[in-house]
Amino acid sequence: MTKNTHLEHPEDVILSGDLTVLNWFNSTDVWTNCNLSVKIDGSPAIVWGTNPSSGNYFVGTKSVFNKKLIKINESHEDIDKNHTGNVAAILHKCFDYLPQTDGIFQGDFIGFGGDDCYQPNTITYYFPEKVRHSIIIAPHTVYTAEDDLRNAIAHPMGDIYFTNNTLIDNDVLWFQPHATIENDTEDIKNRCKFARQIATLCQFPDVKQVARIKKQLNSCIRNDIELDDITLEALASDNKCDINVLRLWKLVASIKTDLLLLINTDHDVECYIEEERCGHEGYVLSNEFGTFKVVNRLGFSKANFNLSKMR
């Protein structure tokens, strides 16, 4: 359970010296009682449910969680007041078709029905046949909030279930591929032990340094700059930080890659980036030690950045 915050890559957390991520990799819950979901590349994010402060049904974007400029839509008139263009058109349909539940949910919008090919963001999804439903939503998060959406607590969602008839009529296609992890963890456990040894040699940077290092690492990934030891030494020198911290970051990133290879997805929807077949954007995995996104940054993040520049 976490506040409604941005999900981190596991390797980025290690930069501050937080070694609980190694417990996250190493926990038996990763393979047994974890909550694993496929990360879908939809847009925009849609939040809907019952507003705890009014008791009314609402839809919105992530702006429903804003501390100041809050945009909660409890009617079509609210949507017209708070939003314009394509986002408003999407929210009008979501207001009509999403289930009016007592809870609070979030999912990514994939598209309107009537086609078999959708590109809401970077990845293009090819469905096996034309979608007959009115809207397509990829649900991923359920929230609890006692009195105000600004205090909402996020919980990862398992298989979706609603009590009304939206699962059997043509209102909503819930796009939620099922993912499993192979129980072959010995190599990951050994590499986590090695990472702990490396951590004993590290002088970890402060919060401001970590933020700057993360931006520079993202820039390298997006611009296809190889993160070899020469690049890491340059980053360490520029940020006046211990080179061993960046070597540890790279090691943890490679452990995450090993984890990715153990995850399988069972779904008949094909994924492409431009003309090249690809896997899903990644996964979100939760256990007793935290919730992290497991994404192939060298593949997806670079493509996402480059396609965003072209639009």
Predicted regions: what is each one?
Residues 1-34, 39-44, 48-311:
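Core nucleotide-handling region used for phosphoryl-transfer chemistry
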